[in-house]
Amino acid sequence: MKFMIGLMSAAIVGLAGAMPAHAETLRVGMECTYAPFNYRTPEGEMAGYDVDVAKGIAERIGVDLEYVCQEWDGMLPALLASKFDLIVASMSITEERKQKIDFSIPYRVSLGRILGAKDAGLKLFDDAGKPNPEAFNGLRFGVERASTYAKWVEAKLPGAEIVLYDGAQPMLLDLQNGRIDIAITNPMKAYLDFLSKENGAGFEFVSPPIDEVEYFGPGVGVGLRKGNDELLAKIDKALEDMIKDGSLEKYSSKYFPFSIQPSGWKGVGE
């Protein structure tokens, strides 16, 4: 299988028109900076769990791939403007997003956790796992812009002092350097890129896993424009096959020392 890798910014793609379900090449939108999910290696190659999933889908439905790098807050508008055909970028399946685009079945879990300093003595949640809004008073709270985490914080902690970031990396750097007190992000990425490293030694998760379906949805899926039902069915079938044959677990084991697969899968085993 030949994979066409076009590492271009979404701003210069400039392609219009809907991609038919039988297309020989599918353009895949992703950030290209979100390791270990989707990123460029020093050699300029695309790598990460999302990339492996996209390749697995392409192999099973018989298409080539072209990668289009796109900043997160412009991901949905770029898809709707036909700058690419699929989003394979760790995007959570939420009701708000489903009003605009379609999603495949999930290919990994979607949740967040809050990080803070070990010596801060933070008790932000009660014994039932619910946040105590008053405990967040006076804390500078790092949140990624236009994310499901931002939606959750705005709804649950309306009085929080939010500091917005364009990605997890600058946010965690500010946490390390004391410019913010706590931060919420993907716990898989936080563990691999921060907590397991020397610079994250003084920090820990200060919340339980936060996975309320209302905000985080049932998991992460492939996004595509509405009206591509044939392509969506092919992608769902490819993902079901990858679940059944263990491919998704194999992909995730390359990057994570723990499972990132949902406990149940729509359509599998029915």
What is each of the regions a protein language model found here?
Residues V51-D52, Y67-P77, A128-G129, I162-N177:
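Short helix-initiation/N-cap motifs at beta->coil->alpha
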Residues G74-P77, M91-Q99, E154-A155, D181-F216:
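A ligand-binding cleft/hinge motif common to bilobed small-molecule-binding domains
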Residues D64, E144-L157, G202-F205, D236-E270:
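Ligand-binding clefts/hinges and TM-proximal coupling segments of bilobed small-molecule sensing domains
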Residues A23-M91, Q99, D245, F258:
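Extracytoplasmic small-molecule ligand-binding "clamshell" domains
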Residues V63, S92, Q99-E154:
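A conserved helix-loop-strand patch within extracytoplasmic ligand-binding domains
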Residues D52-R60, D119-D127, L139-R140, S147, ...:
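Extended ligand-binding regions for polar small-molecule ligands
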Residues G62-D64, A81-A89, L139, P158, ...:
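Alpha-to-beta junction loops
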Residues V109-R113, L195-D236, F258-E270:
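Periplasmic-binding protein-like
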